[in-house]
From Swiss-Prot:
Domain of life: Bacteria
Induction: By stress conditions e.g. heat shock.
Organism: Nautilia profundicola (strain ATCC BAA-1463 / DSM 18972 / AmH)
Record's function text: Acts as a chaperone.
Protein name: Chaperone protein DnaK
Length: 626
């Protein structure tokens, strides 16, 4: 087995790590940074930018720059959270067969495809680091991700050319990185507040065993929401002062978002920050500038309701774990948003002033934990047992639109459970199994994961047929469902319909497209290198001509090729063969010109010597010596 990397595929930033046999270590990206912005951009020239280069050009290219796509991963477009996401991005979120997707220049991309581009960037950078191909990974997801979101993450990995060995919950990964070397038993609470999601997980750890006791959270609460509060405030303030509404100006909105994110970060170390955006817009009276001061106290007031919600999730997690606040030994803070002083203050106060454990790097610890899990799967990490749980209950819709739970929230995974149901009507020969995830009593209030039909049931009075429904959750937290008529032996496994997951055919197509895009990108980079080499050769040839004007004969052929080279470079030609052929022609022509010049100089030198010799003979006087 080759190298396996651990990947934290984050909402705002992603990170990767590996286990070297002793420790988990972060892999820096090509740009030398330990984290990579989870941003993908499409330029007007057809290039795809990922990471820092994509983030840098977002202001001038807002509609083609995709960020925070994790928020719509595995989500149906009619979900309220999807509608909320649409309001806060400058790119276009569209409906693709009911599921959320993004549209750029008329082409529709699924969140899996966008995420795959981020994963491909990480994969490529890891390969450069190791000097060998990387084909396997452990990828993290928020603990509160549902089945559709987990499957979508697996699909993204597959499109990127990665065999995803395991999907692991982010707080659990953080606990692995925190507790790998801990010898005694501890009950810990991981408070994970990232860019887009919030999870709280209670674990019991000791002697290599990591047992999740309970988990809770909100897959739509994080730093993005804090940024959005600042943006909304800036729009409101600017409108009150100038009468101009910036909410429809995509370029202005992107500038506001970037400024809001920066202000949020500055307020973690400063009491006040100034947001200064010159030329944010213009009207008949001329350009308008936005200059606002934001205090830490004002920012904290803006986001207080969101922070209070995180405390309610701690309540639920502790209740589900059957523990009191005083029984928690350590509170491990994870995720970039835990740097906000108010977050730390609220969590510490919740636990009666208990000191928070900030020994781990909140941006890197999840990737490190994923790398440790990769080490466990490879056999490099011994004596580690990880027992995670399902974050939400799973069941089916039964008579009266009620959800009947088959696997309860907090059940240790992997797990397989069955329950026997029957028909609702006489002589019913088919049943529809509607699979649900959530805690609500009514089916309509839960997340629909899909449905399938079991047909061929022998006619019988209602209540007589025995239909066994089996739910099987694997170690990734991914669900498989089957239904079997015990009388006829007919069995049917779930085929999700109207879901956000992709079919095998779609995944294979996307894999091919990703490989083709990768091939084109390699060809583009090779063409750039070839153009640079051509530019250098053309420059040297032109310099040679300019430096030796008086000594050269006819150089029109060389000058014509230099001109052709400049045109190819100006056009940014990607015809590598043509570029290299022209480079060779210029080199050959330059050698010929240089050779001709040398021969000419040699000939001139010989003629001068002959003239000198002739002149010497004329001066000789013949005389006899006496």
């Amino acid at each position: 087995m080759g190298k396996v990397i651990g990947i934290d595929l984050g909402t705002t930033n992603s990170a990767m790590a590996y286990y070297d046999g002793k420790d988990a270590k972060i892999i820096a990206n090509k740009e030398g940074r330990n984290t990579t912005p989870s941003v993908v951009a499409f330029t007007d020239k057809g290039e795809v930018l990922v990471g820092e280069p994509a983030k840098r050009q977002a202001i001038t290219n807002p509609e083609r720059t995709i960020y925070s796509v994790k928020r719509i991963m595995g989500m149906m477009c009619n979900e309220p959270k999807a509608q909320e996401a649409k309001k806060h991005v400058q790119y276009k979120i569209v409906d693709k067969n009911g599921a959320c997707a993004v549209e750029v220049d008329g082409k529709v991309y699924t969140p899996q495809e966008i995420s795959a581009k981020i994963l491909m960037k990480l994969k490529k950078d890891a390969e450069e680091f190791f000097g060998e191909e990387v084909t396997e990974a452990v990828i993290t997801v928020p603990a509160y991700f549902n089945d559709s979101q987990r499957k979508a993450t697996q699909e993204a990995g597959k499109i990127a050319g990665l065999n995803v060995l395991r999907i692991i919950n982010e707080p659990t990964a953080a606990a692995l990185a925190y507790g790998l070397d801990k010898k005694g038993e501890e009950k810990i609470l991981v408070y994970d507040l990232g860019g887009g999601t919030f999870d709280v997980t209670v674990l019991e750890i000791g002697d290599g065993t990591f047992q999740v006791l309970a988990t809770d959270g909100n897959a739509f609460l994080g730093g993005d929401d804090f940024d959005n509060r600042i943006v909304d405030w800036l729009i409101s303030e600017f409108k009150a002062e100038t009468g101009i509404d910036l909410s429809q100006d995509k370029m202005a909105l992107q500038r506001l978002k970037d400024a809001a994110e920066q202000a949020k970060k500055e307020l973690s170390t400063k009491e006040e920050t100034e947001i200064n955006l010159p030329f944010i817009t213009a009207d008949a009276s001329g350009p308008k500038h936005l200059v606002k001061k934001l205090t830490r106290a004002k920012f904290e007031a803006m986001i207080d309701d969101l922070l209070q919600e995180t405390l309610r999730h701690i309540d639920t997690a502790l209740e589900d774990a059957g523990l009191s606040k005083d029984e928690i030994d350590e509170i491990v803070m994870v995720g970039g948003s835990t740097r906000i002083p108010k977050v730390q203050e609220l969590v510490s106060n919740y636990f009666n002033g208990k000191k928070l454990n900030k020994s781990v790097n909140p941006d890197e610890v999840v990737a490190l934990g994923a790398a440790i899990q990769a080490g466990v799967l490879k056999g490099d990490v011994k004596d580690v047992l990880l027992l995670d749980v399902t974050p939400l209950s799973l069941g089916i819709e039964t008579l009266g639109g009620v959800m009947t739970k088959i696997i309860e929230k907090g059940t240790t995974i992997p797990v397989k459970k069955s329950q026997v149901f029957s028909t609702a009507e006489d002589n019913q020969t088919a049943v529809t199994i509607h699979v649900l995830q959530g805690e609500a009593e009514l089916a309509k209030d839960n997340k629909s994961l899909g449905q399938f039909n079991l047909e061929g049931i022998p006619p019988a009075p209602r209540g007589v047929p025995q239909i066994e429904v089996t739910f099987d959750i694997d170690a990734n937290g991914v669900l498989n469902v089957s239904a079997k008529d015990k009388t006829s032996g007919k069995e049917q496994k779930i085929t999700i319909t109207g879901s956000s997951t992709l079919s095998e055919e779609e995944i294979e197509r996307m894999v091919r497209e990703a490989e083709e895009a990768n091939r084109k990108e390699k060809a583009r980079i090779e063409a750039i290198k070839a153009r640079n080499e051509l530019d250098a050769v053309a420059y040297q040839a032109e310099k040679f001509i300019n430096d030796n004007k008086d000594k050269l004969g006819d150089v029109s052929a060389l000058e014509a090729k230099i001109k052709e080279a400049k045109e190819l470079i100006e056009q940014q030609s990607e015809d590598k063969a043509k570029i290299e052929a022209l480079k060779n022609e210029i080199n050959t022509e330059l050698q010929n010109v240089a050779q001709n010049m040398a021969q000419q100089q040699q000939a001139q030198g010989g003629a001068q010597q002959q003239n000198q010799n002739k002149g010497g003979d004329d001066d000789v006087i013949d005389a006899e010596v006496e």
